């Protein structure tokens, strides 16, 4: 059961469990998703875990982490509806499992403090050599992402589908914006984040309330009174279906279909939609997999996913370009069959078992536990895993039929070969 403590400038969330020998700390900086700041926030996430005043180089920091029994430190950015989140994750062995006493938790928290308040920087800028190196690395990573045609085509679909809305903003920003960022500009924005971002820290492991006092002594931020609007971003920018076909030198075409839905985490039909999605395309023996791939051999892979923050369901498939129209038609037919109730209790039971197993897997991974709890916290949903599974179990055949009636195809993006 989560315990939440109001700390100086942040909320501390404890997720006590004796499942793990490690202590996982996940610090989240969240602010409004804005096209003007995503590139800065992404580059900032690259900078924050590269060094501190005490350990200014990557090598020195790595050596220190190794001396802390292989402590791990990493950062990334994600979007959730109208939020852009910088995650800083630290994982270290629980000191209770050491043969002698050593205050690892305090050092783990102190390192987070140093990242923010004793960075490898002057009064006005990060270390210039490190800044240029991480900026170059980020640009190279985004170029590599474009070479990943699954990732590229999905990003392009969201760009078209969400033009002018949060859905259309890439969580990483674009290459040209990143190239324009200057060191002093990024450092100034870093100071803004420390002051204005809403901060949440999650701790997973065999911990008790004594850790609260360690946080009190080692980490504090300026009090933040920022108020954010709802995290949900259910914004539709047009009425008609948008179909985009792009040609590149690819051997396998990438099909992406974006649907609008009206179900979010707090909606009473959320659980029914989770079960529907599993049956339709979210599990290995889904309708889409069995019919489009196995029966008709029209794709190399196919699946559907549900984004409750943006009100979107997405179908992704790898196909031959020549099979585009036939594949789209077959997908539409499978959705129509679901809407007509052409599924049975075995399908429902299989989906519920898959969801249950997925939740069990989540509880076996500390950062997955954090992700689930964070989703609940930012949507103000008071629910345990047991309550969630009980509501999944209570979903009926009719609930599933009802929830899929108002699914609307919004955007199709196909990336195919030049000669197809």
Model-predicted segments: where are they?
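His/Glu-rich zincin catalytic helix
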Residues: 1-68, 172-174, 187-291, 411-420
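M16 family metallopeptidases and their MPP-like homologs
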Residues: 13-15, 21-33, 39, 58-114, ...
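Short, polar/flexible loop-turn hinges at active-site or ligand-entry regions and domain interfaces
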Residues: 51-54, 96-99, 118-127
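Sec-exported extracytoplasmic/periplasmic mature domains
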Residues: 117-121, 136, 143, 191, ...
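Short, low-order "capping/linker" segments at domain edges
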Residues: 140-144, 240-254, 356-366
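Glycine-rich, mobile lid/loop segments that gate access to catalytic sites or pores
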Residues: 144-146, 161
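Active-site glycine-rich loop that binds ribose-phosphate moieties when present
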Residues: 178-188
